[in-house]
Amino acid sequence: MDAAVDLLDPSKALNLKHIRQQLIRMEDTITFQLIERVQFPLNRTVYEPGAVKIPNSNLSFLDWTLREREKTDSLIRRYQSPDEHPFFPDALLKPILQPLIYPKILHRNNINLNDKIKKYFTDQVLPSICHDFGREDRGEQAENYGSTVTADIQCLQTLSRRIHFGKWVAESKYIDDPQGFAKLIKAGDRQAIGKAITKPAVELQVLERIRLKSRTYSTDPCESDDPEPKINVDAVVAMYRDCVIPLTKEVEIDYLMQRLSD
């Protein structure tokens, strides 16, 4: 877990400046992880349940690998951290490490958008960023299925953490104006809450920054005066515009709607 924001320190965990720094650092991580992913073909087979034969499982190869990875991660306390959200909560095991004692920072909530994140990533993001290698999927004995889903899982886990950081953003905004938000929450006015938390100028800055990072990180300046990016820059920007930003706001709104519950 990136430790730029100390979740054991409430004064930092809910400081919007520190949260913003964390989100910007995650932009770097996500961009590099996507660049790593596009080394491999789309390999659609790994997303089809039962297409790769797995003993005692009908899951897709991605889902099976992700589920097994989360089992291992849970043993080393990953999902005790409040900024981590499992894709397969039923797979988690008791950690072998003693628990960290986190202070109560967030209001109790049950928000987990990982199903939406995974569906958008596999259905929309991957087809738009993966290169056409000029061949069909050649099967598990010829394609790098293991490396493919390993790269996918790294992307998914960071995207999940980035999007669910909306809870910290929402709590920070609520603390700044508890009376104003309480009124909207009691009225059940999700649209007004969405308007209150939205800053179009900030969203535009994010998209411009993502475009610059995607192009910069995916080009070799030594190749030519105008090197070709290793990744579809427009597709990365679209992922933020159509998925990361909207789902982060959905997390914020859902969190605020639960903020006054017992």
Curated annotation (Swiss-Prot):
NCBIfam families: CM_pl-yst. Homodimer. Residues 7-261 form the Chorismate mutase domain. It is found in: Cytoplasm; Secreted; Host cytoplasm. Keywords: Amino-acid biosynthesis, Aromatic amino acid biosynthesis, Cytoplasm, Host cytoplasm, Isomerase, Phenylalanine biosynthesis, Secreted, Tyrosine biosynthesis, Virulence. This is Chorismate mutase. InterPro entries: Chorismate_II_sf, Chorismate_mutase_AroQ_euk, CM_AroQ_sf_eucaryotic, CM_II_prokaryot. Residues 1-100 are annotated as: May contain the secretory signal. Contrary to classical chorismate mutases, is not subject to allosteric regulation by tryptophan or tyrosine. Also not regulated by phenylalanine. Its EC number is 5.4.99.5. Pathway: Metabolic intermediate biosynthesis; prephenate biosynthesis; prephenate from chorismate: step 1/1. Changing R162A: Abolishes catalytic activity. It comes from the Eukaryota. One of its GO terms (molecular function) is chorismate mutase activity. It catalyses: chorismate = prephenate. GO terms for biological process: chorismate metabolic process; effector-mediated suppression of host salicylic acid-mediated innate immune signaling; L-phenylalanine biosynthetic process; tyrosine biosynthetic process. One of its GO terms (cellular component) is cytoplasm. It comes from Erysiphe quercicola. The keyword Iron does not apply. It is an enzyme of class 5 (isomerase). Catalyzes the Claisen rearrangement of chorismate to prephenate. May function both as an effector during plant infection and in the fungal tyrosine and phenylalanine biosynthesis pathways. During infection it channels chorismate into the phenylpropanoid pathway, thereby decreasing the synthesis of the plant immune signal salicylic acid. Within fungal cells, it acts at the first branch point in the aromatic amino acid pathway where it steers biosynthesis towards phenylalanine and tyrosine, and away from tryptophan.
